[in-house]
Amino acid sequence: MEYMKGPATSSQGNILCCQCGIPIPPNPANMCVACLRTQVDISEGIPKQVSVHFCKQCERYLQPPGTWIQCALESRELLTLCLKKLKANLSKVRLIDAGFIWTEPHSKRLKVKLTIQKEVMNGAILQQVFVVDYVVQAQMCDDCHRVEAKDFWKAVVQVRQKVLHKKTFYYLEQTILKHRLHQNTLRVKEIHDGLDFYYASKQHGQKMVEFLQCTVPCRFKASQRLISHDIHTNAYNYKSTFSVEIVPVCKDNLVCLSPKLAQSLGNMNQICICARVTSTIHLIDPSTLQIAEVDGNTYWRYPFNSLFHPKQMEEFIVMDTEIIRDRKQAAGAGMRSNKHVLAEVWVQKTSEMNTTQQYHCRTHLGHLLNPGDLVLGFDLSNCNLNDEFINKMNPHHIPDVVLIKKSYDRARRQRRRNWKLKEMDRDREGMDTDDERQYQDFLEDLEEDELLRKNVNIFKNANVPVESDTDEEGAPRISLAEMLEDLHISQDATGEEGAGMLTE
């Protein structure tokens, strides 16, 4: 019986390593791996210790030649930055893998494990794993260096208003906070007649100027100063200054218009009250309820000033009122206000209660005033006015008294005010003793003007209890629907204490 033989199996023979003599599978180098590594180091030329620069102030890393980037520890961006440090040396090998080895955050060391391949003797491919140690060295970036040297700003916006109070700047502060335009501001400096906003770039300063032009009537002038010049790269370093001037007219100011401007506004009376200042000046004629708006360009063509300072307002008591109904509108007259009621009133100064002197006038506050109420206004009959337009008017067309607004108990209004406003961090040149009273005047303006509140974020004040409506005396108040919750970082959305923040 014959047995068939199976196919012969071929097996690869071993060879002896030319260095140590141990049997190994054949390879182009005729060496074992251990001897090959002792003879050839494919990581030769790749530095095993490299330095990276880190700015402690802004927590950014330097990416040569002059770029600073934000990278988290063991992030992909930081790994890319570390590999770029070895880019020239890694060009001769093939990078297979790279990753971080964990180190203590305070050790100032970054360790990266690299896996590389390279063709060595006679076409043999050798793979090697090694660690590169990165030493984190502290270096201040140019931006932080300018901050520490107090020479960090590239543009400044100087906002000025030629008035004796700061209510306009309190309003601007709230609108800036609402639109978050203060985030790019390096520094805000408060001086006696305005605010200075400092920026790191000219574009941020231009953005602030555009915002101011949309918020209040103003005009500006731009200038720049050459700081340095590089003759090799033809690079210029400028500092830009934007000087913004706001119109010197505010809410509750009594003004006298020029005859040409009054005629262009619908044959309006020259003596008017500034009811509100937004992007335009809102005027109302207290004797006819005619209203008009004056924008910034029109104001600078036909400028007018306030006849009185707010401190010159006097307190009157209403003796009698009579509503004027069905008043005919003259031909060519402008629009009339639907929120006010025209009335004739007899008033007497509270400082002259022991006399019989009374004043008769027309007012736009007919919907608010009743006999016995207190009202604030200006006495034109017993004052010396120095204004070019009012001096040319017929004295018979000048009223004796102009009433501005109803007076309420200020202490009571402050006590029941259950809301508050945010404030910007700013450097104060000097605190005026009258600043607190001016700030209270601004808060009262917010309570009295609903349209003004639309541009302001109002927050609930949990420390002040809400009074019942039975204590209401008629003073305007802000409803709870208009207030926002004052949510802090340490609270969650339900108002409870949230998780604590991790700090170093």
Curated annotation (Swiss-Prot):
GO terms for biological process: protein transport; ribosomal large subunit export from nucleus. It is found in: Cytoplasm; Nucleus. Its main location: cytoplasm. GO terms for molecular function: ribosomal large subunit binding. One of its GO terms (cellular component) is nucleus. It holds the Pfam family NMD_SH3. The keyword Transcription does not apply. Acts as an adapter for the XPO1/CRM1-mediated export of the 60S ribosomal subunit. Associates with pre-60S ribosomal particles. This is 60S ribosomal export protein NMD3.
